[in-house]
Amino acid sequence: MEQERNYTNGDYKRLGRRIRKEPDNIAQEDYQMLQDLRIANKSALAATFKALHHAALKIDKDSVCTYRIKRIESIISKLIRFQDMEAQRIADIAGCRCIMTSEENVMALYEHLKKKENKLPFIIRSEKNYIESPKENGYRSIHLNVQTKEPPLKVVEIQLRSLDQHNWATLVEISDVLFQSKLKEFGDKENPDLYEFHRLLAKRDSELTLSDKKKISEISGKYQYLERIGTLFTENHLNLRAQRNKLKTSRNAPFLLISTDKEGKPELKDFSNFDDAEIAYFETFLNNPENKNIVLTHFKNTTFDKISIAYSNYFMTYNETLFRILNSIADVSVYAFNNYKIGEFKKNYKAFWFILSKWFGNKQKEVGLYNEDKNIRKSNKKKKEWTSSITSNVAKVNRIIANMCQGFSSNIWHYFMKRKRTRLEKELASKGYLFFNEKISNTQLLLCKKK
């Protein structure tokens, strides 16, 4: 790595003026200055991450912690949007994110960081608790601006959120890519439907009313939301899984360079050390004719699923919120059936099975790829990781199906199952899947491939 360059406040003021004056014609030297600003956060970010990761694991062994340095194009965008801002004073150039499995664990980590501040390598300068006071669109998270105690004194933004809160936030960004809804930038101005859709999904499960679920089901159907996202996720998941199986992705290669094209197709490279990773990031940024979205991030002892969760807005391979949408459609189906609203029942029930016919077809495709992947045979860890992922997802969907069947009024439901099958259940059977429900009362339900 080249020797560190030093810049004055005046240098940064002049940099901001040059960028605002000609944002489409930024000089190579100015890009280099922005890159130097990024890597100047190296030691502060590493120290903050180490302490945060250690604290998070004590509270939640399944927590996911990452760090990243703000992308060059994001710094430029911020300088243009905020005319008086100086590059070196942007508070979130360096950032850590910790995703906990529950909101209770988020609050436990938050309290721990405040209580143990005297033993940590940073002090908390300011905080915003969007869990106690969510944003209007439903966003929930805790943001801490911390400053390192040891020179060079740097500010790092820490985000603490639960898995559900993270899934929601990343799904908003995925919707913006897939539907050009601009929710993150313009709220409900460009697409009121999808804004309301995500606002409702931001609620906790216990807060969702039947009316909310009906609206979620209605908007999902209008945009074929689960079908379109499901297709994209499957393609990207299989592509990324194959790439990941070729990588080292060990303790010796914790830096991941992610690039995503306009269609949401990701590419992945890994690096053993910070300097090599940053050189690759900067070279990729400068030589990017396809205008790919590029981010460099750091993980520690991670798995494919954790990578997919932490950066699902880049990878577009997986998001648990989709199961919540499917649950809403199932609940509306049950309500309509039990209350003799036949038209509403048929619409939602057919949508439910149409979505699942595609979903199980995609899972079958994934199993086929697993069987064909030569790289997977070299690693028992990757084998176990992949099979566990498939099994877990199938189990989640089967639970949704079982819970839906249990919710139907038994006598009416048995009569219905004897006398009538929807066209889409027949379509599912024609693709080779059998639907068993002999013991509905015990929710003994199975979807399997015909022999």
Name these PLM-found stretches.
Residues 101-105:
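Helix N-cap motif at beta-to-alpha junctions
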